[in-house]
Amino acid sequence: MDDFNLRSENPNSSSTTSSSSSSFHRHKSETGNTKRSRSTSTLSTDPQSVAARDRRHRISDRFKILQSMVPGGAKMDTVSMLDEAISYVKFLKAQIWYHQNMLLFINDHETTSSCTYSPGAGEFGPKLFGYDDDYAPIMDTYSQGVPLTVADSKYTPWFGSVDDEQEHVTYFKYRRATRHALRGHCNCIIGETEEFADQREKMEVQIEESGKNQTSPESIEADKAKQIVVLLIGPPGSGKSTFCDTAMRSSHRPWSRICQDIVNNGKAGTKAQCLKMATDSLREGKSVFIDRCNLDREQRSEFIKLGGPEFEVHAVVLELPAQVCISRSVKRTGHEGNLQGGRAAAVVNKMLQSKELPKVNEGFSRIMFCYSDADVDNAVNMYNKLGPMDTLPSGCFGEKKLDTKSQPGIMKFFKKVSALPASSSNEATNTTRKADEMTANVRVSPVKLGSADIVPTLAFPSISTADFQFDLEKASDIIVEKAEEFLSKLGTARLVLVDLSRGSKILSLVKAKASQKNIDSAKFFTFVGDITKLRSEGGLHCNVIANATNWRLKPGGGGVNAAIFKAAGPDLETATRVRANTLLPGKAVVVPLPSTCPLHNAEGITHVIHVLGPNMNPNRPDNLNNDYTKGCKTLREAYTSLFEGFLSVVQDQSKLPKRSSQTAVSDSGEDIKEDSERNKKYKGSQDKAVTNNLESESLEDTRGSGKKMSKGWNTWALALHSIAMHPERHENVVLEYLDNIVVINDQYPKARKHVLVLARQESLDGLEDVRKENLQLLQEMHNVGLKWVDRFQNEDASLIFRLGYHSVPSMRQLHLHVISQDFNSDSLKNKKHWNSFTTSFFRDSVDVLEEVNSQGKANVASEDLLKGELRCNRCRSAHPNIPKLKSHVRSCHSQFPDHLLQNNRLVARAET
């Protein structure tokens, strides 16, 4: 066969295919193996069915491509051409087998001169290379003309030189790529055409069975390429159907569009019908687009369940301006679901009010946000060019850190719709911004309290395989083994193996072995990126990262260790020294990052776990001299320690209340009613945040309800009361709420850590309203405050706290201040701020508890104390102004006054 004469052709040229095809047909004519004659099948042509029309276009495009690839395909009908394609794939498979095993033969028999080994005519076959006879029928059919003895003069030059071996490698790769391309096009045509179900079954059996013995890592990874379920998320008019049609057109991956508007034989159907159609499409080997609005978790949940080890679930969020969506919906005609005209505007508005943006922890492996037409075009092109064996990186991409305001309401926008330009999305975007500034905004309902915004995730590098030179095969086995062992213990938490190199061998090995064991790829997967910039650059949210450290737990040494210490700054080294000074091989140490650490602030990383693995590098300490029995044992211990450390973090965080990254309402020194600057700020910003919640609770309504009012309250001063009575309306600012208590951040904290513990009881406006029957509530508030102190001190053990009440509060609703005594805050600006926390105007919680228990009420101090001189809270030295006072406080290390050191008024860690 000319096809096997490697000297006569360039495998990288286009002529290779024609050469092999002519050889193939010449062989078939010589052996009398002719094609079976079949009648031509035609495709359905129903002009009323959009789905059928799209299917015809896709089949036609694929058919033309396949005709150009299959030898003689241009002159064949569909059935014959598919049959020929199947045979051609088998032929290529035989060639792959042949060239792959020639490499093995060369490695075993290579000499300095031509090879003299000559197997007999009956020996040249799979058994010669130690294989079963699985390929024997193929070789019997297609290998006639191949020399049966390698001593044949025409083919003897194949053996003995490196150049020849390289030709085998090149030819092997080329044939496999051609085979995969053919399989993809056959899958599309047969999968799209119901008439060819029997050909599909035949092709699957013949092609897939022929590939069972191909075990190279590259082929395993290719054959395991996953189908994709893509959920399009957006209101009517956001362009979901257009996205699908454009992405599917001329795509090399077989797709199916699932649209509820036409799922019932061209008519509107149900969610259940969409699920069934999606399931059927996946079984047929297609990836699917879910063309529904999918605006909230409930709508998405059942479609996400379609994912698993075999399928990836992606989300494409079409977050276009509301005006653009409304304008498109109103103006369009002939819509599949008949949602057009004036009715469409109201529907869009109603849907937007219940919108919940998707999160990775719902089960998505990839989320992509599109805020403009350009973003949408990029996403369309990405999915359009995605081949049958291609994959996309996991993570969250394109998300902008927008405020929590949703798109403006239709009733306030509708008057402007007619003025919206017909087609310019840029102008529409500008209009949106103006409308946002002119109209009140409605908040999007966030996830229910208690559900984590981010799935607990550990990102870890491969331990010991870089500088410590541990064997990659053995290391990959241990990684997969330990990951599989711990996943069942971690609940919803995830493990992510990270490497900086896209061509990383350890990532490929682990990915292939995890796939073989059917490990859930949503909970354990690989990721390419910088482990110190996973969120900012890769869109992957990880709260814990592992560091492959050295025994001294010191920066330096290059690699991951140096990168993590550099990114975290001196805070990590200081925090590490609190936990340990050295580390033994096989051990790990969990280090909480302080909130001041750059990794904590920029990447959301709360903990670093240092782990030390075994060393096989003779130039590094504790070299094991290639003792892999001990090395594997130590590496297993290292991963066990690492995953157990992560498990402890997950369990500890699950016991603590959810914290919000957003700040909350303030009530501290700046809340004193005489502080005009504070009042202006609060009226200007806080009123916007609580206006909607106060609409039904106006000041007049409250006063007319018969509830006790200890003073006349300004409107802004009612914010704490509103939050305490209705915490579910303020989930963006609430850190924790119980039956009797709500915890929030102080909007303008006067120290590094400053939270408020609010009582939820009516008629408790301030300390003067407290009576003995409220003692249990006060004790509960005190205990909750201590819990938050403990949490903050876990982050930074040097912090010292004080818990107490202002004698005369500036905001309605009894609240306990939990404040660190560093007073390091830009929000502390004047004398009233300082004196409200450092004089007897501030009543310690322990004293209030004693007074209420003994005398039935708490003592309150005069507001005149706020006008006193400025004195250091430690040494009590006097200072003329706030800047000089703050400068002194930063450097003052004097002991606190005696009265604060008594009765547990100060809460500090024992080692402080």
Swiss-Prot record:
Record-annotated HIT domain positions: 720-829
Which keywords describe this protein according to UniProt?
A: ATP-binding, DNA replication, DNA-binding, Metal-binding, Nucleotide-binding, Nucleus, Transcription, Transcription regulation, Zinc, Zinc-finger
The UniProt entry, under InterPro entries, shows: bHLH_dom (IPR011598), Histidine_triad_CS (IPR019808), HIT-like (IPR011146), HIT-like_sf (IPR036265), HLH_DNA-bd_sf (IPR036638), Macro_dom (IPR002589), Macro_dom-like (IPR043472), P-loop_NTPase (IPR027417)
Q: Which SMART domains match?
A: A1pp, HLH
Q: Where are the zinc fingers (C2H2-type)?
A: 870-893
Alphabetical list of CDD domains matching this protein: bHLH_AtIND_like (cd11454)
One Gene Ontology term, aspect cellular component: nucleus
Where it mainly occurs, coarsely classed, is nucleus
Q: Where is the composition biased (Polar residues)?
A: 657-666
**GO BP, sorted A to Z:** DNA replication; purine ribonucleotide metabolic process; single strand break repair; sulfur compound metabolic process
Question: Among its keywords, does the record have Flavoprotein?
Answer: no
GO MF assignments: adenylylsulfatase activity; ATP binding; DNA 5'-adenosine monophosphate hydrolase activity; double-stranded RNA binding; mismatched DNA binding; protein dimerization activity; single-strand break-containing DNA binding; single-stranded DNA binding
What Pfam family is a match for this entry? DcpS_C
Give the start-end ranges of region Disordered: 1-57, 657-706
**In what ranges is there compositional bias, type Low complexity?**
13-23
Instruction: Indicate the segments forming the bHLH domain, all copies.
Output: 43-92
Location of the protein in the cell: Nucleus
Q: Which residues form the Macro domain?
A: 511-690
Q: Which residues bind ATP?
A: G234, P235, P236, G237, S238, G239, K240, S241
Report quaternary structure and partners: Homodimer.
What's the protein called, per UniProt?
A: Transcription factor bHLH140
Question: What is the organism field in this record?
Answer: Arabidopsis thaliana (Mouse-ear cress)
